[in-house]
Every structure is written in structure tokens, then in C-alpha cells.
Amino acid sequence: MLESIPPILRPESVEPVALKNFAEKFNLEVVGDPEGVLLTGISMNTGDLRPGDLFVAMPGKKTHGANFVAKALELGAVAIVTDQAGLDLIGVSQVPVLILENPRAHLGDLAAFVYGNVPGNLPKLFATTGTNGKTSTSYLLEGILRQLGEVTGLTSTAERHIAGEVIVSRLTTPESPEMQALIARMREKGVTSVAVEVSAQALSQLRVDGMHFDVVGFTNLSHDHLDDYEDMQEYLEAKLPLFTKKRADRGVVCLDTVYGKAFVKQSEIPVVTITSQMGVDADWHVGITAETPAYTSFVLAGPNGVNIRSRVPLLGAHMAANAGLAIVMLIEAGFSAERIQAAIQNGIEAYLPGRTERVTGATGPDVYVDFGHSPDAFLNTLAAVRKVTEGRVFMVFGADGDRDASKRPAMARVAAEGSDVLIITDHHPRFEDPASIRKALFDSAVEARPNLEIYEVSPPEAAIRKAVSMAKPGDAILWAGPGHQDYRDIRGVRTPYSARAEARAALKENGWA
């Protein structure tokens, strides 16, 4: 069974844009007659195209979008934007063709204009980037905004939120036509503040072009995505454009990794700094006051003696650091520390699907399902679990196929060093041999801790059952990798699958209800 793909979210009503005005706005050459042509949407993908759309035909990795113009016209496209190469492929067109070299570089601005997302007509926009913590920070930011009385929107790896409506996500950061349509839908629903999770890939592919954020935040940078970027320096440089005058007014940088200083040094916009580390010089400091399996209490200390106390409904000091970053971003946006303290004095109200999510029953071992899939994520989460666990710590994990393989040895090493019992299983093998992935992880784990109790169990539903069958009350199980995801990718087929549901079922089968 294939995973259903959520539809593109668009505003329910759009003020049509005259193609003639559109062409004049962007100074585009028009082949054909634009007179009387009205645009009600924009798409770069025929799978999302609707009647009245402007179809943007761009060169791709394998083929040119101009090869899909016939399909676009069948679906109701009323005009085409393409480059000279695309025009040559199209030949004689039934609809007007607008010539624009490098359409992708302008796609965000084109989409913003079509959907009426112009300065003075937008909600407050917040963006968070980093290797780990950007989803959590975005959810916490949205939660605090809601407690402050804002009507909120969210776009993240896990979900999209529009004034309380929840929709499954397709990408961490959607392509710019989808993003602009989403923002327009949020405006239509009265959203006043939006938290946006921004990946390095989104910045490299210009998906947030056409957007200008009130405040942007940086969480951290660690080993990941080196299948997309040559090295850590290139990965860093992919994220830096979020801290430019083109994209934001102000920034908040976490100094918990060495790359934070690079952001401060290279930022084009004013930034303030935050840390949860002792001995690090920063404007704001996060200190932990209590940790339990259900929540982490903290104090955020800042300039002029400001102290904000609250708790986050998640396990781990790293989650408190994410909450601190979210709070400082709000202060930089103009919300007063006093108002924020009053709103969150009894805790931050947010549900983060698959982020150290505790799926434990009333009895039995604590079981956490987490999305973390990098060495640094493993390190932080294992440390947090260890701190609140009296008994043994079990870890269940696998590695993504057809993704950055260079991080696998470090993932296995951290997993081995941080657990008492390690169970290696499958994650998304994609087109790789899952047995080969497991063997590589197993070998690295054994090398790190030769005497550790290590098992190789496939498929993952058997792996979690193995862990639960071995665990006792007082023990904890961390299943790292699947998090919120509701599928497994096996040879290009996304099969419905929920790690959280499997974990709950395993607990029930073992009498831990």
C-alpha cells in the first residue's frame, strides 16, 4: 500500500492577477497575447496544477519542465514561464509564454505576487534552521505564541498547522509555490504568527525565496546530510543565507556547537546569542532546574537581570535549550519578557510528535520514540534518557538507506557507548540492502564496545518487541529514527507504518498496559 501524499494547501479564494500586470511587474518578455488572461495560482509540478495556474517550466536534473507543458495545458494552465531552452522545446504554444532565465531563482517572488503575499499584508514570520532541534524549536515557538493569544501557523518536518487545523507534511520546507500558497491560506484563516522550519536543502534550492522573516534562529550544526554537501563547511554555508538582510530582520544564534560563532561572525543582520553550556559567553543562558521522564524545568537568564522560568513537556536539557531559543526569538520580535513569563509560568503547552515522545503505559519500562538520526542527536537523547533512568537503557535504531552513509559508524559508536543493550534494526532501506546496512552498524558498534550486549533484529516491529520483552520496570527503551513518520520506504514504496503504534502494541502484548 502506498502512502497517500497530502494535497497542496491553497487559499480558498484568490484575487485573480492579470497576466499583463504580472509580466510588467517582473519585466518579462511575452510570446503570445497576455490580454484578458488571469492567474489564480502557480505551479512547477503538473501533479499539483489547477485550472487557472501559471505553469513554471524549469530545467531539472533529468529533464526540462517544458516537456510537461502539454500535460499542464490539459490540466488548465493558462500561461507558461520558462527560459529560452524551454521556449525552444515548447515551440508554438496555445497560451502565452513568458521568458525568464533561471526561473527557479525568481520562483518565490513570482509565487508571492500571485498569492498577494506582500509586505504589510503578512503575519509575523519566524524561521529556525540547524541540524537538530529545528522541528522542536518550531513547535515550542508555536506553542508559546498560542499561549500569548496569537492565531498560529506552523510548517515543519512533521506537520503543517493553520489556525488549529493539522495537516501531514510533504517536505520539511515546501517548494516556494506551495509555501506561498500556504502562507496565503494562513492569512485567509486569520493567522497572525507563523513558525517555519527551514532546512539547508530548502535554502540551497531557494524554497524560502520571496519570504522575509521577522526573526530567524539557529540551533546547532553537526554531522548530517553530507550526501548533499561535500563537507561541514559547505553544509554550514548552505544555512548562512537565512541570516542575510534579504531574508530576515534579526537573528538568535545558539552557541552550543562551535558553528554558532561562525553564524555570529558572518551574519548580515543583528543577532543575539544563547547557550545552555557552562562557561560560554552569550547574551542569554539556559539552566536546568529539574528533569523527569515527562518534563524538563529551566530558567532562562538574560540581560538586565531578566529571568524567565518555565518547563517544557519533553525529556532532556537539549529540549530546554530549544525552548530558550524560541523564547528569545519572541523577545527579539517585540514580545516582552514579562508577558512571556505570565503566559508560560505553568509550562509551555506543546505536543511534539515523535520528539523523545514517551509512549509508556501506566506500568512497565519507559519507552521513547524519537526522530533523531544523527550522532549528535543520539548523544543528547541518550544522555537525557540515562539521567532519568534507574535501570538499564536499551536502544533500538537503524540507518537510512541511500542517505549520508559517512555518519553511520559514528551513530553506531554513540549508540553503543550510551546504551546497556543495543538492538540494531532497519529504518528506511530504500534501494540499499538492509542486511548490509545492519551489518555495517553492527560491526561499528562491536568495535566501539566489544563486550556490549548487541542484537541484530529485523524487521523493526520485531526489534521493538525484543527490547520490550527484555526490559523491566525501571528500565528505558529509546527507539531512535522513526519519530513521527507514518511510513517505511522500501525500494521506493512507502508502506504505512508507525513506530509509536508498534511500541504501544509491544508493551500491551507484554502485559504493560
Where are these regions (language model features)?
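Phosphate-binding loop of NTP-binding sites
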Residues: 106-255, 261-268, 389, 511
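Acidic, Mg2+-coordinating active-site environments of NTP-dependent enzymes
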Residues: 23, 88-92, 213-367, 443-450, ...
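Well-ordered beta-strand positions
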Residues: 54, 79, 215, 250, ...
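ATP-dependent carboxylate-amine ligase
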Residues: 1-28, 51-54, 64-67, 305, ...
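Short, hydrophobic beta-strand segments that form beta-sheet elements in well-ordered domains
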Residues: 41-43, 76-83, 196, 251-255, ...
